[in-house]
């Protein structure tokens, strides 16, 4: 699904949830700047999952990464380490690298996760794992119960991967292919 289509559909979800015009929803705006509060974010999340047939992660990418890396590697005393900055810049391609110079408070990171374009990229990444067609007969797939989709023709069912599972996979890949080689080079130097 093209990013522009995802943006348009997500803008409609946000506009409907916040009772605003869709034109007010721009890529760089934060949902809180549009008036979203915690209950609105829950409603937006649920509607996004329903309309896109995806399951958003419950934890932030940083929380997931701390589970893989362990404590103290990505953040210390409430601030990102250099490795934490590298990981987030890699995961948030729209983030301005200048915002990650100097001391970066973990608490201040929330604004990136509330930006519309961050949501759109996250949705795009999850939609990539939602099959449109059945692997058995190439007929369209339709949402079923819970984390499942069902073929409209042959009835074959699949279980969708959760956003949590996909985040863990991405972090593990980053850890194995980017962090470990970098950390090993630093130790041997």
Segments (PLM) and residue ranges:
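Phosphopantetheine-dependent thiolation modules in NRPS/PKS and related acyl-activating systems
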Residues: 1-45, 50-189
């Amino acid at each position: 699904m093209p990013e522009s289509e995802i943006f348009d559909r997500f803008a409609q979800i946000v506009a409907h949830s916040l009772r605003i015009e869709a034109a007010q929803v721009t890529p760089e705006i934060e949902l809180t700047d549009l008036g979203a509060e915690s209950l609105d974010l829950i409603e937006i999340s649920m509607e996004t999952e329903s309309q896109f047939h995806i399951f958003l992660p419950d934890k932030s990418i940083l929380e997931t990464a701390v589970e893989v890396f362990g404590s103290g590697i990505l953040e210390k005393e409430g601030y990102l380490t250099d490795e934490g900055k590298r990981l987030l810049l890699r995961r948030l391609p729209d983030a301005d690298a200048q915002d990650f110079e100097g001391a970066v408070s973990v608490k201040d990171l929330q604004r990136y996760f509330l930006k519309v374009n961050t949501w759109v990229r996250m949705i795009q990444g999850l939609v990539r794992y939602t099959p449109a067609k059945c692997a058995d007969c190439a007929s369209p797939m339709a949402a079923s119960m819970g984390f499942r989709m069902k073929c409209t023709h042959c009835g074959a069912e699949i279980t969708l991967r959760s956003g949590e599972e996909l985040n863990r996979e991405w972090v593990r890949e980053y850890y194995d292919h980017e962090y470990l080689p970098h950390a090993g080079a630093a130790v041997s130097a």
